Curated annotation (Swiss-Prot):
It comes from Homo sapiens. This is Metaxin-3. Pfam families: GST_C_6, Tom37. It is found in: Mitochondrion; Mitochondrion outer membrane. One of its GO terms (cellular component) is SAM complex. Part of a large protein complex spanning both mitochondrial membranes termed the mitochondrial intermembrane space bridging (MIB) complex. One of its GO terms (biological process) is mitochondrion organization. Coiled coil: none annotated.
Length: 312
């Protein structure tokens, strides 16, 4: 019997099986294709790598990045696109490229760069999933990585300043959402009544943006005006993830939000404490290193010591 396929990914909240877009893409595709994945949610007991999440562990190998994981699943006969025509397959590749170029930078900015969102939602949530003291370090690194990823792809002339880049990525993201809404129309999925790879990608990118409660919501507000995209996300959640979610009542979600607020305060206090300790250590006077005294041997002792070194 073949070893089960195990997917390591970030966990969920706000009614989502995962708050991480790339993890959601793989989870949705596995549901659509019937791939029997065992999901291992990363929490504060996790000791593995988090840099390339999601990670698919097979009997012989480890696969990371959504595109590579989906290709592996297709080779294992778990193909959500088997009913698509050649043109629909080409459209899928074009739309995925559009999502990664036009929508992903705005999603990264909303979660990791927008200051209010990062400090009140993103940082405390991810810190709660990571063991101490990495919980104080890794979210910051992930934030810098997201910013570098945005600037690498969008910080080209004539957009030199971050504010110019921010304005452009949100314009592009809204245009992308409008295009997706027009393409979906009144259909259940993008290519009819059966979900495919494109549906997994769109769901993975849109669902966190739609469900997570942010203080700064300019792109979220635009998305919520596109009712067919919101219905698309809700239908996938209710049809494919209902049992795994267990349902969160409004009262329960308020409890989650209250706990997150407490966690935010705790993480910020710990971060401030470590910064103060670091500043104190840097400012404290540093004593010169002590030199060990050199013992001088008498001629007789030197002769005896030399003889002992030569002895077996």
């Amino acid at each position: 019997m073949a070893a089960p396929l195990e997917l390591s990914c970030w966990g969920g909240g706000w009614g989502l099986p995962s708050v991480h877009s790339e993890s959601l893409v793989v989870m949705a595709y596995a549901k659509f294709s019937g791939a029997p994945l065992k999901v291992n949610v990363i929490d504060n007991t996790w000791r593995g790598s988090r840099g390339d999440v999601p990670i698919l562990t097979t009997e012989d190998d480890m696969v990371s990045q959504p595109a590579k994981i989906l290709n592996f699943l297709r080779k294992q006969k778990y193909n959500a696109d088997y009913e698509l025509s050649a043109k629909q397959g080409a459209d899928t590749l074009a739309y995925i490229a559009l999502l990664e170029e036009k929508l992903l930078p705005a999603v990264l900015h909303t979660f990791w760069v927008e200051s209010d969102n990062y400090f009140t939602v993103t940082k405390p949530w991810f810190a709660s999933q990571i063991p101490f003291p990495l919980s104080l370090i890794l979210p910051g690194r992930m934030s810098k990585g997201a910013l570098n990823r945005i600037l690498l792809t969008r910080g080209q002339p004539p957009l030199y300043h971050l504010r110019e880049v921010e304005a452009q990525i949100y314009r592009d993201a809204k245009e992308c959402l409008n295009l997706l809404s027009n393409r979906l129309g009144t259909s259940q999925f993008f290519f009819g009544d059966t979900p495919s790879t494109l549906d997994a990608y769109v769901f993975g990118f849109l669902a966190p943006l739609y469900k997570v409660r942010f203080p700064k919501v300019q792109l979220q507000e635009h998305l919520k005006q596109l009712s067919n995209l919101c219905r698309f996300c809700d239908d996938i959640l209710s049809s494919y993830f209902r049992l795994s979610l267990g349902g969160i009542s409004p009262a329960g979600q308020e409890t989650v939000d209250a706990n997150l607020q407490k966690l935010t305060q705790l993480v910020n206090k710990e971060s401030n404490l470590i910064e103060k300790m670091d500043d104190n250590l840097r400012q404290s006077p540093q004593l010169p290193p002590r030199k060990l005294p050199t013992l001088k041997l008498t001629p007789a002792e030197e002769e005896n010591n030399s003889f002992q070194r030569l002895s077996p």
